Each structure stands twice: as structure tokens, then as C-alpha cells.
């Protein structure tokens, strides 16, 4: 459903979307393994051609675009986000979710995204890193949202936040 929110494509072919929030929530809510597998299923469905990405994109062609690294990083980012949530049980849920989302949902996913942009756009590490800076403010807002959403869900239905069970 987050792919249905309109995208804003930057000049180098990578769109700003709400989908990274989904990756963050996979980890904060479902935990490491379930979250990583849910994100992997999403990527597999995209590869099979389902139009789940922003703008109704799907199919193997998206894996030849500058977004390939981000897509490959989604399951790993969700896993890392969930792993941090699983390990950091002593912190308040919202704080743990926000920090986990930054570390797994931003840093890990960006590492893959930067590599993908280096390969598809023929950019240096520095050039690709500078290109992704446009995403940082929005993704930090999404990480804060992931913290609030996960905290609210934990209060309303504690058993539904599997990263804490």
C-alpha cells in the first residue's frame, strides 16, 4: 500500500517514496526474521512483476535501474532493524524503534543503495553518497514515524509487536 503513495523522482532516477517506512516497520513490528522475510517476499513479488513499487512499477527491469541496491537492501535492512529491536528490550518501544529504524532502515539500506547507484550510474563512492543525501531528511522523518507507530501499536495491541514478544 505504501507504493500507492505518489512518488517524486529525483534527476538521477531514484524516487522518493514511502516504501522505506514499510521496511522499517517490518523490522520494528515483526522482528528480525519475520521482518526480513516479509521484506524479502515483497522484493520477490516485485521481481515476479507485481506493480508494488511507487508508480506501479514491478518486474525484473527495476533490478537494472538505480534503485536496485535499495531493493536488495530492503530485506537486510528490515532484518537488522528487527535484530536491534529484539536485542534492545530495555529501552522504551518508541525509542528502540526509532533508533533501530535509523540504523537498519536507513544506514543498512543506504549502504546497498549507494553500491547499486555506483554500479548502475557509474559513480564513485563519494558521488553516490552525495546523491543519497537528498533522501536523508525524509527518511529520518519516516524513522520517527516508525517509532511512534510501533509504540502506538505496542500500547494498543501489545501481542502484535512481535519484536517484543
State where each predicted segment sits.
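Hydrophobic transmembrane alpha-helices
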Residues: 1-36
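Residue-level signature of transmembrane alpha-helical entry/exit and packing/kink sites
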Residues: 16-23, 35, 66, 70, ...
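Alpha-helical transmembrane segments in multi-pass membrane proteins
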Residues: 3, 23, 27, 38-46, ...
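Juxtamembrane membrane-interface segments at transmembrane alpha-helix termini
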Residues: 27-29, 49-56, 141-143
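Membrane-embedded alpha-helical hairpins and interfacial helices in multi-pass inner-membrane proteins
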Residues: 12, 56, 88-165
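Interfacial aromatic-anchored transmembrane helix boundaries in multi-pass membrane proteins
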Residues: 2-15, 43-77
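Structural signal for the C-terminal ends of transmembrane alpha-helices
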Residues: 29-33, 80-88, 152-157
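Alpha-helical architecture
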Residues: 17, 29, 63, 111, ...
Amino acid at each position: 500500500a505504501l507504493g500507492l503513495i505518489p512518488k517524486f523522482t529525483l534527476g538521477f532516477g531514484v524516487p522518493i517514496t514511502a516504501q522505506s517506512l514499510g521496511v522499517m516497520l517490518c523490522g520494528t513490528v515483526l522482528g528480525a526474521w519475520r521482518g526480513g522475510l516479509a521484506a524479502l517476499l515483497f522484493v520477490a513479488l516485485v521481481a515476479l512483476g507485481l506493480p508494488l513499487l511507487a508508480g506501479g512499477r514491478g518486474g525484473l527491469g527495476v533490478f537494472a535501474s538505480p534503485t536496485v541496491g535499495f531493493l536488495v537492501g530492503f530485506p537486510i535492512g528490515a532484518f537488522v532493524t528487527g535484530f536491534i529491536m529484539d536485542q534492545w528490550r530495555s529501552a522504551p518501544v518508541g525509542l528502540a524503534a526509532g533508533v533501530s529504524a535509523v540504523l537498519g532502515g536507513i544506514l543498512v539500506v543506504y549502504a546497498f543503495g549507494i553500491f547499486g547507484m555506483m554500479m548502475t550510474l557509474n559513480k564513485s563512492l563519494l558521488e553516490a553518497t552525495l546523491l543519497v543525501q537528498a533522501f536523508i531528511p525524509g527518511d529520518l522523518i519516516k524513522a520517527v514515524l516508525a517509532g511512534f507507530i510501533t509504540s502506538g501499536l505496542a500500547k494498543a495491541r501489545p501481542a502484535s509487536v512481535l519484536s517484543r514478544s
